[in-house]
UniProtKB/Swiss-Prot annotation:
Major place of residence: cytoplasm
Gene transcribed to yield this protein: Shpk
EC number: 2.7.1.14
Keyword Phosphoprotein belongs to the record: no
Effect in UniProt of substituting residue 126 to K: Decreases sedoheptulose kinase activity
GO MF: ATP binding; sedoheptulokinase activity
PANTHER family according to UniProt: SEDOHEPTULOKINASE (PTHR10196:SF67), SUGAR KINASE (PTHR10196)
Catalysed transformations (reactions): sedoheptulose + ATP = D-sedoheptulose 7-phosphate + ADP + H(+)
Keywords, comma-separated and alphabetical: ATP-binding, Cytoplasm, Kinase, Nucleotide-binding, Transferase
Protein name: Sedoheptulokinase
């Protein structure tokens, strides 16, 4: 009996790197079984030399180190069976490298690994160097999506103005997931799906092309823009044996983490997917043939992103999710340190969730937008309806969790989901899976059945895309 196909899925997230091995299982409702998975903290944050405190950058070497640790932890005999590799990662961000010099393949024990060489830091989606006045000075995009700070093309424009010498050092650019695919396959030029291209800005999803005329007129270095390919198609094949994965293994075009996450758990077209990790996304599938209005509206809280097969997802993407809870925990730890007390962040997190679980309701209202929002960058967080009876840790934590969900509701009213034909909400994401209070607030807010999926994340989605692609190729 021929062995069933196995695919490897990788997700290069903001705070962690995940890897998952999936095997086809036609007899199961899901169609697959998870053989193994692994996650490692990236711990890649680093200072920005040119952007100062507004910058949000990550050390690519540390991200790849976390990836290597993930692969090293997976069963070697299963890695030998891998027939396809799917890669997803954090959208909007950008790193630069020298073509042909982006990495070096080295012996790492029994197999080869690659290590970054002539690469820049990754400027992430959280980067804040492009303020409102700078964004207003940029040319108008020929796209249904507007441009925000942290978007790849906006970052290039900023570097062009503030650090032009920096750009002269590199001749290739992409998201972190595009970089990994390019290194695995030894691509002479990076390839990018429309999912990631749209997240950079200045990309027209209908024509599947960059706004080259607009960008050229503005002096933009268009040679840095990757070539475009269909999500779900093949980028190339591995140029080396990699952690027991055979040389010549198919590698898919890199996907956006949003699309891969949605793909992993949208069982029906009538499902909406709520993902609460570092940030928050609420996504629903648009009808086939839907085309967004071609005029970008920076004030619109709902964006329409490319999905698969030229369809779109309607997405409310909030910058404020698990990172808000992390900020609150860090604040409490810092306050206690100022008072001469030491306590672990993990202890504070678990205690505050316990306290909120016992506090079933509160009048305290927290608008949790400590990072602003893309459509309202200057509207920061606030606390209202403060009374002396609502100041316990339980009250504040309950109000914070409720505020995260209500902020999303203000961006995409749940009545709109009904009009799109949504019948169920599937909840996923690390912040949701480990926070019972946040789950309660989600169930309270949505007028639909809510189910919380197990093992729902972008690494599984990336593997699943490759697995189903592999199976469809076998069909007559």
């Amino acid at each position: 009996m021929a062995s069933r196909p196995v695919t490897l899925g990788i997700d290069l997230g903001t705070t962690s790197v995940k890897a998952a091995l999936l095997e086809a299982a036609p007899s199961l409702p899901s169609g697959f079984v998870v053989l193994a998975s692994c996650a490692r903290a990236a711990r890649a944050e680093t200072e920005s030399a040119v952007a100062g405190p507004q910058g949000r950058e990550q050390d690519v070497t540390r991200i790849i180190q976390a990836l290597n640790e993930c692969l090293d932890a997976l069963p070697r005999q299963q890695l030998q069976r891998v027939r396809g590799i799917g890669v997803s990662g954090q959208m909007h961000g950008i790193l630069f490298w020298k073509a042909g010099q982006g990495c070096e393949w080295m012996e790492g024990g029994p197999a080869f690994v690659f290590e970054p060489r002539a690469v820049s830091h990754l400027v992430t989606w959280q980067d804040g160097r492009c303020n409102s006045s700078f964004l207003a000075s940029l040319p108008k995009p020929d796209s249904h999506l507007s441009v925000a700070t942290g978007f790849g093309c906006a970052t290039i424009f900023w570097l062009l103005k503030n650090s032009p010498e920096f750009l002269k050092s590199y001749d290739a650019a992409g998201t972190i997931q595009d970089y990994v695919v390019a290194m695995l396959c030894g691509l002479p030029r990076p390839l990018m799906s429309d999912q990631n291209a749209a997240s950079w800005g200045y990309f027209n999803t209908q024509s599947q092309s960059w706004n080259l005329d607009t960008l050229e007129k503005a002096g933009f270095p268009i040679h840095l823009l990757p070539d475009i390919a269909e999500p779900g198609s093949m980028a190339g094949r591995t140029s080396h044996t990699w952690f027991e994965i055979p040389k010549g293994t198919q590698v898919g075009i890199a996907l956006g983490d949003l699309q891969a996450s949605v793909y992993s758990c949208m069982g029906q077209r009538t499902d909406a997917v709520l993902n609460i990790s570092t940030s928050v996304q609420l996504a629903a599938s648009m009808p086939v043939g839907f085309q967004p209005l071609q005029t970008p509206d920076p004030a619109a809280p709902v964006a329409f992103f490319p999905y698969f097969d030229r369809t779109y997802l309607g997405v409310a993407a909030s910058l404020n999710g698990g990172n808000v809870l992390a900020t609150f925990v860090h604040m409490l730890v810092q306050w206690m340190a100022d008072l001469g007390l030491e306590v672990e962040e993990s202890t504070v997190y678990s205690r505050m969730i316990q306290a909120a679980a016992q506090q079933k309701d509160t009048h305290l209202t927290i608008t949790p937008t400590v990072l602003g929002e893309r459509h309202l960058p200057d509207q920061l967080a606030s606390v209202t309806r403060i009374s002396s009876s609502d100041l316990s840790l339980g009250h504040v934590t309950r109000a914070l969790c409720r505020g995260i969900v209500q902020n999303l509701h203000s961006m995409l009213p749940f009545q709109q989901l009904k009009e799109w034909g949504v019948a169920r909400v599937v909840g996923s994401g690390s912040a949701l899976s480990r926070n019972e209070v946040l789950k309660q607030e989600v169930q309270r807010a949505f007028p639909f059945p809510v189910c919380f999926g197990q093992d729902v994340d972008a690494a599984f989605g990336a593997a699943l895309v490759m697995l189903q692609r592999d199976l469809s190729q076998k069909e007559p």
